[in-house]
Design a protein with these regions (language model features):
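Dinucleotide-binding Rossmann-like beta1-alpha1 core, especially the glycine-rich loop
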Residues: 1-75
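Local beta-strand N-terminus motif with an aromatic residue
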Residues: 3, 24, 200-201, 323
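Active-site/ligand-binding neighborhood in enzyme catalytic cores
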Residues: 35, 43, 70-187
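Conserved flavin/dinucleotide-binding core of flavoenzymes
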Residues: 48-52, 249, 266-385
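Short, well-ordered alpha-helix to beta-strand connector turns
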Residues: 168, 200-201, 356
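A structural signal for the hydrophobic beta-strands that form the central parallel beta-sheet
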Residues: 172-174, 205, 361
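Mid-domain catalytic core of redox enzymes
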Residues: 176-285, 290-298, 303, 311, ...
Length: 385
């Protein structure tokens, strides 16, 4: 019910795989099924995978395609805009609505009008700031970039966490609810289960912002962390009869935009990416529902919501078979949102860390929400300590 893949987009991920000696266990997606889909006029449409494909496709209107090339003449932003305002300014509204909004809905499940471009798409923001143009900046940086590559394991990403557990299991304490974090002189005191106390000089904290805000000794930080909102995500796994799917779904998945009026944010075609996860005559897919766009939908009766989702999927992929498997899970507080006040929040966290030596806050609400982001942050802090 968590991440479906991890992206190798930094050296820390490579180093972790090497340290755990699991390089031979890594599975990469089926190269023949690397397409991504959007919806246009109720039908699946492939996202172009090259500049040539993009020019020939009808994914954007001709005027929207022409508008993109004017990006190189637009002055860089003076301050941090929302994702919506940034892309509307540099590439045009249609580019945002058709390509950017569905993508970020799939990652953050949030509202692009309330997301900070500086923190949500940090690399794009930095390229614009450094080169004055996103297009020109990426052309100049292209040769230096690591080509991102996603991966998984035979039994899912639990293989990764299990390997980490095996390596450090003697140092882990399970079933331990932290009820307070205090500071006594130059030491930090952690109270567990309202009873057991631990004292340490160095502390790394990765718990969610809403949880840390309730137990931290610093009132200002507590109030700051409460400003971070989390959106709910309903995850639904479905098993289908492969031969009854009439439309081509040989790809990674499909993302939706608000105007599609679907009952889900996106679908991942799990068994098309990693064939081993389902029998050869079956298909496994993961449906994502909720986020800031569909919070009201999650208040619908669960059975009615399921029926609506299945109806939408049947129509989209032209499926007349049975639903042979169903498993679902609701994350009430699924994904932290990097809002327009995130600059202030990050600065307050840094101020706290500066005042409290060797206290490191490293949740996924700081400098990236992905697994690879968290691995990179952990690597950086481990070297500091």
């Amino acid at each position: 019910n968590g991440p479906n893949t991890v992206l190798i987009n930094n050296e820390s991920v490579r180093d972790l795989i090497s340290d755990l000696k699991i390089k031979n266990d890594v599975l990469y997606p089926n190269k023949n099924n690397n397409k991504r889909f959007l919806i246009k006029k109720g039908k699946l449409i492939k996202i172009p995978q090259s500049f040539g494909q993009f020019i020939k496709s009808n994914i954007l209107s001709l005027s929207a395609k022409i508008r993109i090339f004017f990006e190189i003449f637009i002055k860089k932003s003076d301050n941090s805009l929302s994702v919506y305002d940034f892309f509307k300014k540099r590439f045009g509204k249609e580019f945002h609505d058709v390509l950017i909004e569905p993508f970020l809905t799939g990652v953050y499940a949030g509202n692009t009008r309330k997301m900070s471009i500086k923190h949500v798409l940090k690399k794009i923001w930095e390229v614009e700031q450094n080169y004055g143009s996103v297009i020109l900046g990426f052309i100049k940086k292209k040769s230096r970039n690591i080509t991102p590559k996603s991966f998984n394991f035979k039994n899912g990403l639990s293989d990764l966490t299990n390997k980490i557990h095996q390596k450090i299991k003697d140092k882990i304490r399970f079933n331990s609810k932290i009820t307070s974090i205090s500071k006594i002189e130059n030491l930090y005191e952690i109270t567990v289960n309202n009873d057991i106390k631990y004292r340490c000089s160095k502390l790394i904290c990765t718990i969610p912002a809403y949880a840390l805000s309730e137990i931290i000794f610093d009132e200002k930080l507590s109030q700051t962390l409460k400003k971070i909102s989390y959106c709910p995500i309903y995850v639904l796994h479905l098993g289908l009869e492969k031969q009854k799917i009439k439309n081509d779904i040989s790809g990674f998945g499909v993302l939706t935009k608000p105007s599609d009026n679907k009952s889900f944010l996106g679908i991942i075609f799990n068994s098309r990416i990693f064939p081993h996860v389902a029998p050869s005559d079956k298909d496994l897919m993961t449906v994502m529902v909720g986020g800031t766009r569909q919070e009201q939908l999650l208040k619908t009766d669960k059975d009615l919501l399921f029926d609506k989702i299945v109806r939408d999927i049947r129509k989209l992929i032209s499926y007349d078979g049975r639903i042979i498997m169903k498993h679902d899970f609701l994350w009430d507080k699924g994904i932290p949102q990097y809002g327009l006040d995130h600059d202030y929040i990050i600065n307050e966290i840094k101020n706290f860390e500066n005042k409290n030596k060797d206290f490191h806050i490293m949740g996924n609400y700081v400098n990236g929400i992905s697994v690879s982001d968290c691995i990179e942050k952990a690597s950086v802090v481990s070297k500091i300590l």
